[in-house]
Each structure stands twice: as C-alpha cells, then as structure tokens.
Amino acid sequence: MALRTRLGEILRPLNSEYGKVAPGWGTTPIMGVFMLLFFLFLLIILQIYNSSLILENVDVDWATLGN
C-alpha cells in the first residue's frame, strides 16, 4: 500500500496524463528539429573554442575575459 502524503495529493493533477499516448508520430518531428538546432549550436561553440571558426575583431583569449 502506497503512503499518501500531502505533497503527493498536490502533485497528482500533474500526473493525470499518465499512460496516454498521442496517435502517430506526435511531436517527434519537432523534437528532431530542436535536436538538430542544439547540435548546430554546440558545433559552432566548439569551432569558436578551437579557433577554427574565425570571427573578425573577436579575440578568443582567456586573458581578455577578465578585462
């Protein structure tokens, strides 16, 4: 038997959609688009860090960050 707590009763409405699945693909394509955009963001950050993406007049040096 599960212990019933006040917090559990407050949070119960948040779990009302448990077990319900949208038919078909649902929002999977949207998730794929956001994953691709996040990957591109990480790739750009990595290229800036490695200085393989050169930006004009932007100094990527740890010493200049303190100024």
Swiss-Prot record:
One GO molecular-function entry: phosphate ion binding
Transmembrane segments: 29-49
Keyword set, alphabetical order: Chloroplast, Membrane, Photosynthesis, Photosystem II, Plastid, Thylakoid, Transmembrane, Transmembrane helix
GO CC term, one of those recorded: chloroplast thylakoid membrane
Its membrane topology: Single-pass membrane protein
Localisation: Plastid, Chloroplast thylakoid membrane
GO biological processes: photosynthesis; protein stabilization
Alphabetized InterPro entries for the sequence: PSII_PsbH, PSII_PsbH_sf
Pfam family membership, one: PsbH
Function: One of the components of the core complex of photosystem II (PSII), required for its stability and/or assembly. PSII is a light-driven water:plastoquinone oxidoreductase that uses light energy to abstract electrons from H(2)O, generating O(2) and a proton gradient subsequently used for ATP formation. It consists of a core antenna complex that captures photons, and an electron transfer chain that converts photonic excitation into a charge separation.
Family in the record: Belongs to the PsbH family.
Subunit structure of this chain's protein: PSII is composed of 1 copy each of membrane proteins PsbA, PsbB, PsbC, PsbD, PsbE, PsbF, PsbH, PsbI, PsbJ, PsbK, PsbL, PsbM, PsbT, PsbX, PsbY, PsbZ, Psb30/Ycf12, at least 3 peripheral proteins of the oxygen-evolving complex and a large number of cofactors. It forms dimeric complexes.
Name listed for the protein in its UniProt record: Photosystem II reaction center protein H
Organism, scientific name: Gracilaria tenuistipitata var. liui (Red alga)
Gene this protein is translated from: psbH
